[in-house]
Amino acid sequence: RGNLKTGATQIKIMGGGGVMSDFDPIHSLQPSPAEIRAAVQAASDWGTYVLAHAYTAEAITRLVENGVKSIEHGLLIDDKAARLVKEKDAVISTQLYIFRKLLVSDYMTDFQKEKADLVRAGQENLIRLIKKYDITTGFSTDFIFGEYAGLPGEFTERALFWSNAEVLHQATAEGGEIVRMAGKLNRHGDFGEIREGWVADLLLHNGEVLEDLSVLANPETNLALIMKDGEIIKYKP
């Protein structure tokens, strides 16, 4: 409630252990079911939802059973938990590129590196289950290493597992769907699709992205136009 008072549009809780944390193992379960329900009730009272950091199937199951609507990361999910996510109309907001490419650093402790290796090993299973149950998944920016670090690389990483059109749908329509889960607290309006009456946020790139997603991975050279809410912010022919 304090975070909502200061302007939060949705609430994030930590559902289990983290890679970069110094003390908690990945398998640890953190909030109790009652604590999760209390957070969900507080968010619901304001017309919004709760998202949660979680890797393991056990954490995901506890969170979703108690009302959490978005799982951040989710790399160690199993079939039963994935089916539950779908049944409860929850989503998985994950990152692929950063775990395979960026989450390897000399400044990480041995404990952190062990945890990174553990969650990285679950990536292909997560992808398989997202496909199997047709779970909504957006492009998450829930990571470190600078503002939006590695986000352009997410396009080419996902293209290893999905068609270019599917990847674009995840980054736009599905991402918009997730943000709109904030309901009455959604400050962005209807966006994520090109549709009459919706927010006119558009990017134009020099290249055919349905044929080559690497066009999107190099915005410094390929991004020709940025339109924000109908206003041209950048134009470079």
Predicted regions located by residue number:
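Active-site core of metal-dependent hydrolases
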Residues: 14-124, 132, 136-138, 205-206
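Short alpha-helical functional segments enriched in proximate histidine and acidic residues
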Residues: 2, 177-179, 226
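Alpha-helical scaffold segments that flank or form the walls of functional sites
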Residues: 1-12, 41
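C-terminal cap of metal-dependent C-N hydrolases
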Residues: 186, 191-237
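Receiver (REC) domain switch/active-site residues of two-component response regulators
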Residues: 9, 69, 201
